Amino acid sequence: GPNGAGKTTLISIVCGIVKPSSGKISVENFDIIKDYRETRSRIGLVPQELTLEQFETVFNNVSYSRGLYGKKPDPLYIEKVLKQLSLWDKKDLGLRQLSGGMKRRVLIAKALSHEPSILFLDEPTAGVDVELRKEMWKVVEDLRETGVTIILTTHYIEEAEAIADRVGVINQGELIIVEQKKELLKKMGNKTLTVELQEEIAKIPDELSKYNLTLGDNNTSLNYKYDLREKRTGITNLLQDIKDSGLKLRDLKTEQSNLEKIFVSLVKENNEV
């Protein structure tokens, strides 16, 4: 969702940080208000800000978080989490000695310290460079393999496209769609057929005007957009009409709409309602 859409507010409500003004939310059949301890123990939260005890060691930071949830000390589990996040060799270092990327890993370790089944990552790559962002994507992918359900908020479309199984779009405090990523691309994505020509043309022939074509780079290609949901895309007729118009084809290629185009379309439609 865009900035100010309500992503962090929604997460804060689910995690029990902000009290909802109305409605009901349950986590694994436990009400977040009536069963606060039960729901909170099932959730790990990695906030946007680096909230860490700078003068403590990595190991003590993570162990302390486990105790906050009433869990007994378990050095072996903490060791497992730190190794999983490539932090074990830094367990005795103070937080002030770590890079920004490693500090974010410590935040994830703290969120996993009490063995939650759901992990919220609130814009974990906001404000970081491209290299660190891709490093965090790898961490998320590795965590997913362990069976933890991960809910990640982001306004980087490429991030959702790279690592998400399901995508939800929130705008003006409303969750306007939740869909499997592949299904979302299939249902809402348009495709573009690019017809590459053997020779440059000055303009699109009048007999092709009904197809709403656009000229491509260097006036040597024609672009045709069509809806995947339609039974008839019109491609067969288009190619025949191109041939009849005297244009000579060199190549054909298609391009699928990406999540960014779908996201912009959804938000625009929602704002107009």
Q: Could you say what each language-model-derived stretch is?
A:
Residues 63, 67-90:
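Conserved ABC ATPase "signature" region
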Residues 115:
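Conserved catalytic motifs of ABC-family nucleotide-binding domains
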Residues 94-98:
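Conserved ABC ATPase signature
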Residues 23-34, 39:
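Conserved ABC transporter NBD signature motif
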Residues 119-122:
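Catalytic Walker B motif of ABC-type/P-loop ATPase nucleotide-binding domains
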Residues 137-227:
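ABC transporter nucleotide-binding domain
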